[in-house]
């Protein structure tokens, strides 16, 4: 399905199947669920190739949503099993500061020992002890939670890209709105390669798909109101807006 929606998505699939470093900037389609489906597809593709996956998400809300999506495709969260000896098992683990120290350390040991190959968490998960040419993904790389205010001021985006480059992995930056860094990296004409930056292949949905998935938007500026022959063009809330709001209230709530 993603192949029919995004350009350059085949390059990402090839990278996940390959053995060399590649970086991507992916612009997910609108919607609270679509980005999770994209990430789940990448995680599944990486795990099928025997590659670990590290997912750095902004807050616990995104982590819980992502865990739910991974479970919907058949992956199990690291948790106690039904065995009588109290063993733990699972396909992915969560690392965050809200966990009890014992639970967090147990998940850390499972990751470092290779028992769990997929990690999702907040900024600190960028240091997850995975080895090999893993998938390193960050969501909304411009959010303030990803910046460290202490020396050496490590940023999650730079750390993940550095790890991917050092281990011939795949780096993916996802956001509904590209960060300045991501936009810079998608222009091969001027971007320079450093340890934490360089060219990234842009992955964007086809125009027709984006138009179909996007909400209908109209800007009621003076030109548009004049075109509609609205006599209340100078009012704080023009008659056209009042009419649209009144009609919308007949079928549901309105956010103003």
List the model feature ranges, each with a label.
Residues 69, 83-119:
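Conserved motor-coupling elements within RecA-like helicase/translocase cores
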Residues 2-36, 172, 176-256:
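Conserved interdomain linker/interface between the two RecA-like ATPase lobes of SF2 helicase motors
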Residues 125-167, 171-172:
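SF2 helicase catalytic motif II
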Residues 51-59, 93-95, 253-256:
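Conserved RecA-like ASCE P-loop NTPase motor core of nucleic-acid helicases/translocases
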Residues 59-63, 98-101, 125-127, 141-144, ...:
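Conserved nucleotide-binding/hydrolysis micro-motifs of P-loop NTPases
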Residues 35-49, 71:
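Walker A/P-loop NTP-binding motif
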Residues 61-87:
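Conserved helicase motor "Helicase C" RecA-like lobe of SF1/SF2 P-loop NTPases
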Residues 93-101, 143-153, 227-233:
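Flexible beta-alpha connector loops of hexameric P-loop NTPases
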